[in-house]
Amino acid sequence: RDRAWVLSSWQVIVDEYPAMGTEIRITTAPYDFKGFMGMRNFTIETMDGKKLAWANSNWTHLAISTGVPVRLTPADTDNYILGEKLEMDYAPRKIKLPDDMTSQESFTVQKHHLDTNHHVNNCQYICMAEDFLPEDFKVYQMRAEYKMQAKLGDIICPKAKAETGKVIVSLDDTDGKAYAIIEFQQK
């Protein structure tokens, strides 16, 4: 059908990191569709139901051939069973950049950064941004806003700003346009 869901943004909160070997249960459910967007929650719980982490994600419905967002129709959404919207503090989808970010050393996108569509994998952007966290920084909340797709050989020019309890990283192209913006917060 020439359609795909592309992750636009997400907000992940980790209240407790499980110990190695802890049995966990992962849940996910879409909870709303609007225009060309779909919204989905995730949880990680212990087997007795204690919530360890939870997330919200926003997905854009695209035409694969053009990369342009396409309005959802009942044919696109009827097969989904909507779940309850998770009770959590929902952060805005867009991440505001501070004015005084510091440019960091640029690097080239390598093969190991790519997904099956030959673009940088969403999690790889998070790993790239983690390089700018102080060593003792324990992430409580991570937010990511995806703006453009980087491909093999593209140059990524990071900018970062550390504030009290927060680090913001913008992973830009050589013209200063962001591929992804990531915000990490401590508890």
Predicted regions and their residues:
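Short structured motifs
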Residues: S8-V14, I26, Q141-Y146
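HotDog/MaoC-like acyl-thioester-processing domains
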Residues: I13-V14, A19-K96, A150-I155, K161-K187
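Acidic/His-leaning functional-site neighborhoods
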Residues: M101, E105-Q186
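Hot-dog-fold acyl-thioester-processing enzymes
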Residues: R1-S9, L52-N58, A63-Y140
